[in-house]
């Protein structure tokens, strides 16, 4: 677990996708559209896992509770050779139940974003300049568009040392998706 100290934090962004980059990549909404307006919030201290939950760790939960394994498993066994890769095919409810079993909880979006941006409020965990080679992204040269072992991109860690907050696999948070309060973006969801 990584300790994140209390303090003020700029949640969201005031940036606009003026170049329509997202749309050019086939993403149906402009970057940042649902992350505005930016607001200053004060967050209490919290802890967050250093790495994504691995297949090996998730198997302890499956075995311990007799929970239903993800759909990509063969019975109670995860795919061979994926011990230290982040577990996939896990619903929000599965993730929440795992957290309860582990005596933890899914972080709310504000805490997840704070862990990713650091107290400086970087745009990316490593700073304000996008560097695709620092994370396991599907368009990274040499990428097979598959997850890799957690912590494989140490230079992408946040200032406090949380890994894989960009790329590899998506993470669940404890709140529903929705544009930020005060946003003009209209979501279809």
Please identify what each model-predicted range represents:
Residues 4, 48, 54, 58, ...:
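Terminal peptide-recognition signature
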Residues 46, 53, 59-71, 102-103:
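Short capping motifs at secondary-structure boundaries
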Residues 1-10:
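Mature N-terminal segment immediately following signal peptide/propeptide cleavage
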Residues 10, 14-19, 23-30, 68-189:
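Functional-site microenvironments in short loops/helix caps that host divalent-cation chemistry
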Residues 38-40, 49, 159-161:
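Short, surface-exposed beta-strand/loop micro-motifs that present aromatic residues
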Residues 8, 38-40, 45:
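Well-ordered beta-strand positions in beta-sheet-rich domains
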């Amino acid at each position: 677990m990584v300790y994140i100290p209390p303090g003020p934090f700029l949640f969201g962004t005031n940036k606009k996708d003026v170049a329509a980059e997202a749309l050019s990549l086939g993403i149906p909404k402009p970057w940042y559209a649902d992350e505005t307006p930016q607001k200053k919030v004060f967050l209490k201290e919290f802890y967050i896992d250093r790495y994504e939950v691995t297949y090996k760790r998730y198997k302890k939960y499956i075995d311990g509770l007799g929970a239903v394994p993800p759909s990509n498993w063969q019975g109670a066994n995860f795919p061979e050779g994926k011990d230290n890769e982040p577990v996939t095919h896990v619903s929000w409810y599965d993730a929440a139940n795992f957290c309860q079993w582990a005596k933890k909880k899914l972080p709310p979006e504000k805490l997840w974003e704070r862990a990713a941006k650091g107290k400086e409020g970087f745009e990316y965990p490593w700073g304000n300049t996008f560097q695709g080679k620092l994370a396991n992204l599907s368009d990274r040269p040499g990428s097979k568009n598959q997850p890799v072992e957690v912590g494989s991109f140490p230079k992408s860690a946040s200032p406090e040392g949380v890994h894989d907050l960009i790329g590899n696999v998506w993470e669940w948070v404890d709140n529903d998706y929705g544009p930020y309060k005060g946003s003009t973006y209209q979501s279809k969801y």
